[in-house]
Amino acid sequence: MAKKEIAKIKLQIQAGAANPSPPVGPALGQHGLNIMEFCKAFNARTQDQKGMVIPVVITAYADRSFTFITKTPPASVLLAKAAKVAKGSGEPNKTKVGSVTMEQVEEIAKLKMPDLSAKDLPGAVKTIAGTARSMGIDVK
């Protein structure tokens, strides 16, 4: 018999830096999950991606066990890193904060492909280029 799923928890945590403080502790604690066990497992799985923000989907079960799936970093984080900017523009249509090449956009699209709804690479490239435009980053 399959375990009874009681919740799906979505978080974005710094790779290799999960700890019991908010937002991780309260999110897991309210479902009765072992916070330290999750933190150790997450940090072990993401230690090679230090410095990146990693989205994670945690599935909590009725017997207080859990499983989790890590996803690729958000496109906005990858674009900001490629353009060497701290954050996107507050006025993306007026003020440009940086630029990326089409090759960099293609690399990000290839990396993000499993998490995007695009059917093929050109569609994924358009999605990433749109994200760049909405952040005030020029695509050259």
From Swiss-Prot:
List, alphabetically, the SUPFAM superfamilies matched.
Ribosomal L11/L12e N-terminal domain, Ribosomal protein L11, C-terminal domain
Keyword RNA-binding (UniProt): yes
Post-translational modification remark: One or more lysine residues are methylated.
- Name of this protein: Large ribosomal subunit protein uL11
Q: Which UniProt keywords apply?
A: Methylation, Ribonucleoprotein, Ribosomal protein, RNA-binding, rRNA-binding
- Biological process according to GO: translation
A family per Pfam:
Ribosomal_L11_N
Quaternary state and partners of this protein?
Part of the ribosomal stalk of the 50S ribosomal subunit. Interacts with L10 and the large rRNA to form the base of the stalk. L10 forms an elongated spine to which L12 dimers bind in a sequential fashion forming a multimeric L10(L12)X complex.
Give the organism, scientific name: Oleidesulfovibrio alaskensis (strain ATCC BAA-1058 / DSM 17464 / G20) (Desulfovibrio alaskensis)
A GO molecular function assigned to this protein is: structural constituent of ribosome
Functional description taken from the UniProt entry: Forms part of the ribosomal stalk which helps the ribosome interact with GTP-bound translation factors.
Query: Where in the chain are disulfide-linked cysteines found?
Result: none
- GO cellular component terms, semicolon-separated: cytosolic large ribosomal subunit
Q: Which residues form a coiled coil?
A: none
Would you identify the family this protein belongs to, as annotated? Belongs to the universal ribosomal protein uL11 family.
Keyword rRNA-binding part of the UniProt annotation:
yes
What Gene3D superfamilies does the entry give? Ribosomal protein L11, C-terminal domain, Ribosomal protein L11/L12, N-terminal domain
